[in-house]
């Protein structure tokens, strides 16, 4: 069961990052984040379920994993999404300030939007969720390897490491 939970958490994290990205490129306010979740999940449910299945198989040693009847409710951690949305809505300015402070010679306005989305999610986790810092940083770096250019994983890792050092968690 543990591997399924890991696949669920990774899938959820990946798609909340995509929602943050969508809000960023559409120049929408984080006040609307919670309102957009259900439509975003519904519109992307097939992709989300397929990604979950891919990760569940990748993380599992069980080659007979039963995934045929997988529903969106099985693959998304709604509680995690709601917690992230609430924290981002209430604290996005503080999160961006922290990112700007630790991104030497960069600001969130000048960084690639995907990098910013990954950083916002990870800093949010580090500050406001019970996710272990190492897990949050590792997941952010893994997302950067998939969605960003070659320099981004190191860049993101450096910023997040610096944030963790500052807050002393």
From Swiss-Prot:
GO CC terms for this protein? cytosol
Q: Which GO terms describe its molecular function?
A: RNA binding
> Which key words tag this protein in UniProt?
RNA-binding, Transcription, Transcription antitermination, Transcription regulation
Show which residues constitute the signal peptide.
Answer: none
Its GO biological process annotations read: DNA-templated transcription termination; transcription antitermination
SUPFAM superfamilies for the chain: NusB-like
Q: InterPro entries per the record?
A: NusB-like_sf, NusB_fam, NusB_RsmB_TIM44
Q: What does this protein do?
A: Involved in transcription antitermination. Required for transcription of ribosomal RNA (rRNA) genes. Binds specifically to the boxA antiterminator sequence of the ribosomal RNA (rrn) operons.
- HAMAP family linked: NusB
Query: Which protein family is named in the record?
Result: Belongs to the NusB family.
Q: Which protein is depicted?
A: Transcription antitermination protein NusB
Q: Which gene encodes it?
A: nusB
């Amino acid at each position: 069961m543990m591997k399924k939970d890991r696949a669920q958490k990774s899938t959820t994290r990946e798609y909340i990052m995509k929602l943050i990205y969508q809000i960023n490129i559409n120049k929408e306010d984080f006040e609307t984040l919670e309102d957009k979740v259900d439509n975003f999940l519904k519109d992307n449910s097939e992709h989300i379920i397929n990604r979950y299945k891919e990760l569940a198989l990748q993380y599992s040693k069980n080659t007979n994993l039963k995934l045929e009847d997988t529903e969106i409710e099985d693959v998304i951690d709604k509680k995690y999404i709601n917690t992230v949305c609430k924290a981002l809505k209430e604290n996005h300015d503080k999160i961006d300030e922290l990112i700007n402070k630790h991104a030497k010679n960069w600001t969130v306005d000048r960084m690639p939007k995907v990098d910013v989305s990954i950083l916002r999610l990870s800093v949010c986790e580090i500050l406001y969720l019970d996710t272990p810092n190492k897990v949050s940083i590792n997941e952010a770096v893994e997302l950067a390897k998939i969605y960003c250019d070659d320099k981004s994983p190191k860049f993101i890792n450096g910023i997040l490491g610096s944030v963790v050092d500052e807050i002393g968690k």
